[in-house]
């Protein structure tokens, strides 16, 4: 006897939990099968890049994360001391961990167990979603004949629970079961890549040391080897990554070897380990799956489809973004808002990201090894590896902010007028600019108006509506958008609020106190919610604030207020299209490529049929 689910997620890794949170946000139930007996208690990953923190913020989770995590503000670079007798190290340079202006969020450190626990809590808050522990997935198959039927359950998942076989049928399946993915192996997919001869040890320790930068992230490259230190949350524990001697077998490494190698690199500073929380050893390698999906019904995420060295803090972060990418797309299809072709964009977008990551990690890992100099690494005037330059140049990449999704049905750079908003790059995530909310003078970041709640956004930048030309532009666009043939009503789910699928956000320029509410067309103050009240929280202005200065959002986004601009933003905060204010049909043409008109939904949900935004 089998059980049927809209989505079965194999493994409760970071990618799977992020996707499940999206599904919960849309009101879609899923089944999460985890082989462990309970939640992760000790996690290997710890670095949380700024894009990941932005994603936390979009789900309303950032406050807790920022309170508990260790804020990684500065990086110190240490190298061999040429004046010392024998081996020794000296600080060469200090730099910011994140370039100012890259993001309004910091890079932070928090263990993966707590990181994942926050996602578990977020799922529960939304629809009570839980993880089924003690289920070891053994086999996944896809009936490709059924896969073309949107109402079918073509995926079969077999799992073992307490010695008993359990069978689940699903419309869709996500593999979030790690580098040794049972799902990937069942589908006959292979990991392609290589493993180098370089072996590293890692340990989370409570150090007694006179090393002055022990509470900073440090990159140390000495004649004795290389080390990366990462201060952990709580103020005492430190993670130490250390390069081990050539020819080391990772499976034979002992804790004593890791500690001895660390002491040699730290010399002349002392390193006495008071306690060890966790330790491991691993060879450096980069591998990527030869396929990321099967029949548009099974999708690989996280370590199930890409593995690499952990020293740049990418694994957990890229996995999170895999889940963040596929989750809302699955929910959109299951809710009947978009056709299944939307899911094809997951592979198009995330496989490219994985390819870039793997190639970049090969260079990064080589630079960190002591043999890099021999292979033409970045060197300073003395022939030493100048890793600080490598690190600084890679900041935007490691922060997760250089991801650019290529053209597809939901990302249309080719049909955009990029000159209308030169810094709103199509395919990239929307950068945060400071604005003022019109109704109450609250200072906000633009991204705070775009939470991860499943809605598409049409962001309108009309300019200063005290000018007749700008006022006319805004009124004409509003009339079109909310008309019966405009995109807002065309795709609106029956009985839903006018802003439940596509929300319109207006960002004015000019002086707030000289603009009256009745100068803004009524269409932009929709009546919504249980009490059918006017929503006054959709209008913002680029103006001086009482305490935070002027955000200059128009300048930041490269928008001429005399001409205005429109940006269409995806539910995951990536920019889909940029248009000029008069291109009304261009907005409709965008949504026509993938949204389902009322009454044209593909299939139906097994769980919730009504549209909900938890």
UniProtKB/Swiss-Prot annotation:
Cited InterPro entries: FAD-bd, FAD/NAD-bd_sf, Phe_hydrox_C_dim_dom, PHOX_C_sf, RIFMO-like, Thioredoxin-like_sf
Enzyme category, top tier: oxidoreductase
Enzyme Commission number(s) of this protein: 1.-.-.-
Physiological role: FAD-dependent monooxygenase; part of the gene cluster that mediates the biosynthesis of terrein, a fungal metabolite with ecological, antimicrobial, antiproliferative, and antioxidative activities. The first step in the pathway is performed by the polyketide synthase terA that produces 4-hydroxy-6-methylpyranon (4-HMP), orsellinic acid (OA), and 2,3-dehydro-6-hydroxymellein (2,3-dehydro-6-HM) by condensing acetyl-CoA with two, three, or four malonyl-CoA units, respectively. 4-HMP and OA are not pathway intermediates, but are rather shunt or side products.
Record-annotated membrane-spanning stretches: none
Family: Belongs to the PheA/TfdB FAD monooxygenase family.
Phenotype upon loss of function: Impairs the production of terrein.
Protein name: FAD-dependent monooxygenase terD
Gene from which the chain derives: terD
Cofactor(s) this protein cannot do without: FAD
Induction annotation: Expression is under the control of the terrein cluster-specific transcription factor terR.
Keyword terms of this UniProt record: FAD, Flavoprotein, Glycoprotein, Monooxygenase, Oxidoreductase, Signal
One GO molecular-function entry: FAD binding
Pathway(s) of this molecule: Secondary metabolite biosynthesis
Signal peptide: 1-23
Alphabetical list of CDD domains matching this protein: PHOX_C
Glycan-carrying positions: 260, 317, 602
Biotechnology: Terrein shows anticancer activity on various tumors including cervical carcinoma, ovarian cancer, and head and neck cancer. The secondary metabolite acts as angiogenesis inhibitors through the inhibition of angiogenin secretion. Terrein also has anti-inflammatory activity. It shows an alleviative function of age-related inflammation characterized as an anti-oxidant and might therefore be a useful nutraceutical compound for anti-aging. Terrein may enhance osseointegration by decreasing the level of ROS and has a potentially synergistic effect on osteoblast differentiation.
Binding site for FAD: 6-35, 44, 137, 239-241, 282, 303, 319
